[in-house]
Amino acid sequence: LLDRHVPKADAILLGHTHFDHALDAPAIARRDGATVYGGTSATALLGLHGLHDQAVTVEPRRTYEIGPFEVTFVPSVHSKLVLGLKVPNGGEITCEHLDGMTPQAYCCGQVWGIHLAVAGATIYQQGSADLLDDEIRHTDIDVFLCGIAGRQMTDDYVGRILPRLDPKTVVIT
């Protein structure tokens, strides 16, 4: 499916490193020579695949120029999906060998909201239904890609994030 719609990726942006977000990043990076941007767990994951040189460990609130895009990684938190008490598989990826990478080994790592600006348009992607309220400084967003898994476990998630971003369009993901 990806090959049909995205013939070549130049960059991969990881908001966190649970398997459902990061599993295919090394394969796509290897296939296309793409650079993977994310936290320290993303860098560790790429290193396990022998792709350390294709990983960028991002800095909070720094803007990266990636082709025509300006990309900013905004510190965030993951929703507490386990009975509303804890983040599943929290912590960093610590495997030293690829054969140890079970789904549970894909620990959350650092969590980011991702702000993109291109050609006068802005997009904000929140892959997990929680946030650090004071970290959201981008407003008047054109498109908000709103991750909602776990929103029931986060106090007033939608009521907190929507006024901060003030998006024109919301896409539920």
What are these regions, as identified by a protein language model?
Residues 1-58, 139-145, 166:
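Active-site metal-binding motif and surrounding structural segment of the metallo-beta-lactamase
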Residues 16, 24, 71, 128, ...:
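Divalent metal-coordination and catalytic microenvironments
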Residues 10, 129-173:
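Cap/insert and terminal regions of metallo-dependent hydrolase folds
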Residues 1-7, 59-139:
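Core dinuclear metal-dependent hydrolase active-site scaffold
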Residues 18-23, 43-46, 60-64, 80-82, ...:
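Active-site environment of divalent metal-dependent phosphoester hydrolases
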Residues 53-64, 68-73, 160-173:
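Ligand-binding grooves and catalytic loops that recognize ribose/phosphate and carbohydrate rings
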